[in-house]
Structures are given as structure tokens and as C-alpha cells.
Amino acid sequence: MKLYSFFNSSASYRVRIALALKGIDYQSVGVNIRIGQQNALEYRRLNPVGLVPTLITDDGESLGQSLAIADWLDRHYPQTLLLPQDDSARMRVLEIVYAIACDIHPINNMRVLRYLGDELIILLAGNGILSLLIELQRNIQQ
């Protein structure tokens, strides 16, 4: 199994954490998105969207999107599950996972930040991300 990822990508972190929790051996391949390596033809053959992470399975299948990869890992390596089996606990975990992946990640994404000036970045970080994290913390503490 081979994981193409950027060291500082939160989506890549999610997959590396999932692989570590499951104790799965894999080869790590760095993709430096700061210099545009995700746009190289060789990488685009693996992931036509040009995002990290990309997991290449032992069967040669190319998987993208961190949550889809985590789901695939849970289905193919069920010995250690990433999500609780209890429906209520599972839903609470998924609420947090989706809040991070769908609400926080997009406004802290390098592709988005490149187009914003410093003033907007500070506004997003100060108001958007911080308020979402505070709400998540409240949700977790309940």
C-alpha cells in the first residue's frame, strides 16, 4: 500500500492517523503541494483531481478523499474499527468528523488561502475557524 500525501495537510494527517491506529504498513510518498507537485502529470494519473492524499491499494486501486479512504480502510481492515459500532456514539463521532472535514477544513485549505488577502485570512481564522472549534469543543464536552 502506498500513501501519497503532504506532510502538513490535515486531510493527509487523517489518513496517516487511520493507518497508524489500524497498524497498517504502507509506503509514504511525499507530494509537495507548496510547489505544485500535485499538478504533475504522473500524480494526476493517480488522482485526476490533483488533491492529497491518494492511497494506492495493494490491488493498484487509487483512492482519494480522506474520509472515503478511512471508510475503505474500515471495510478492508475491520480488526480495529475507526468508528464505534453503537449508532448513537457513531453519529456523535461522525458529527465531529464532518464538522472538521466539511466546515473547518475548507476555510483553512491552501487552495482557498492563496486567493485571500491577509486581512480575510485573519478574519476567517479569528471568527470562522475559532468559533467552529469552540462549538466542537462544547459538543465534545456534553
Residue spans for each PLM region:
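Amphipathic alpha-helical packing segments from all-alpha helical-bundle domains
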Residues: 125-142
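GST-like domain detector, emphasizing the conserved glutathione-binding G-site
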Residues: 1-124
